[in-house]
Amino acid sequence: MLIYDDSFATAMTATRQEATDLGAHVYGSEHLLLGLLAEGGPLADVVSGRDGAVTYDAVRRAVTHAIDDAPLLEGLGVSAVAAGLADAPRPRRTPRNRHSPELQAAMSAASAKWGRLRKIGELPRESRLDSTVLWLAVLEPPARSSRLVEALGADPDDLRAAVLGAAAVPGAPVPAWPTEVRRGPVTRLVHRLMDRGSRSE
């Protein structure tokens, strides 16, 4: 059975802290991306090394100023910075173990695709779940974090390929990311572990 390793646990703890610091009501993919970057580690180094625009400070500014929503807000005649300021100051509270629908959708899609690549042998079948699946989730197209990455001028598909390359067996080709797969037990397990990780102190 898969259990999570320290990289997964520390990323979830950092995600919880980021959501709390930003006064969020729920955990979103943007908090997960910030948590992954705040904790650092080999995959964070891979992502930042692939595109220097994706750093903790840059993503934090992007989240605070809602740069992913700027085109839509401007179309409505609202400044993204003004919209962000209108929401401040936010009370400091910890979300009560609720994940936003976009984060749930991204985690479901990423964990199902990741599980498929493991099943067919294109990624190692490790016994411990690490932060790889979390990185893959924040780069999924429906996730807000993916839009933030694009707004910073980076390519989520390119970063995903870098993450997959780092996760693959050394010397093996980078596996192609599946477009659609059926969700199964790995997806349910990842959701349970995320829930547990976001509750832990």
Per-range role (PLM):
Residues 1-201:
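Histone-fold recognition with a strong bias for associated Lys/Arg-rich disordered tails
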